[in-house]
Regions:
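Short hydrophobic/aromatic patches at helix-to-coil boundaries
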Residues: 3, 154-157
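Amphipathic alpha-helical coiled-coil segments
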Residues: 59-73
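Residue-level signal for pocket-adjacent positions within structured domains
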Residues: 1, 16, 37, 43, ...
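Conserved NTP-handling cores and scaffolds of large molecular machines
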Residues: 18, 22-25, 69-73, 133
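N-terminal cationic and glycine-rich segments that engage phosphates or anionic surfaces
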Residues: 1-63
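Non-DNA-binding regulatory cores of transcription-related proteins
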Residues: 75-149, 155
Length: 157
């Protein structure tokens, strides 16, 4: 079984989402299906069809979360040692062309959230940064073409 690297924060969020889905969302959708069933003919009952679709989405997400949680390898980011970029690193980079600075934490694929600067370890940028150190230049193939960055700092916080 392949382990999925995850921060403690990411693991907790997955557990919380699973708990909400199983204890709140699933019962609500079962209730909605029962209500829609009571309206008669199911073949033309849009309310019923919608509720069944929602149930399918919820059950699929529950299965996905249970699988991820069972395969999770929780990594204490603060205990990671070394100067090179690994899972859990908080990295500040500078775009060599625009001079724009950005900071990201490299996290597992289930906890990536670009709005909160959490970058999936499977993303092209993260893959290009892994193994590099401060002050190194790195070139990344992006949808906009080849981008060049300078690594300003690497921290494990």
């Amino acid at each position: 079984m392949n382990k999925i690297p995850m921060t403690a924060e990411g693991y907790t969020k997955l557990q919380d989402e699973l708990k909400k889905l199983t204890s709140e969302d699933r019962p609500k959708i079962i209730e909605a299906i029962a209500e829609a069933r009571s309206h008669g003919d199911l073949s033309e009952n849009a309310e019923y069809q919608y509720a069944k679709e929602q149930q399918s989405l919820i059950e699929g997400r529950i299965i996905d979360l249970e699988s991820a949680i069972s395969k999770a390898e929780v990594i204490d980011v603060k205990s990671v040692e070394g100067n090179d970029i690994k899972f859990g690193a908080t990295v500040e980079i500078e775009d060599d062309e625009s001079r724009e600075k950005q900071q990201y934490q490299i996290v597992g694929e289930y906890e990536s959230d670009i709005e909160n600067k959490k970058l999936s370890i499977t993303s092209p940028l993260a893959r290009g940064l892994i193994g590099k150190t401060e002050e190194e230049n790195v070139e990344i193939n992006s949808p906009k073409g080849l981008k060049s960055y300078t690594i300003l700092s690497v921290k494990y916080i």
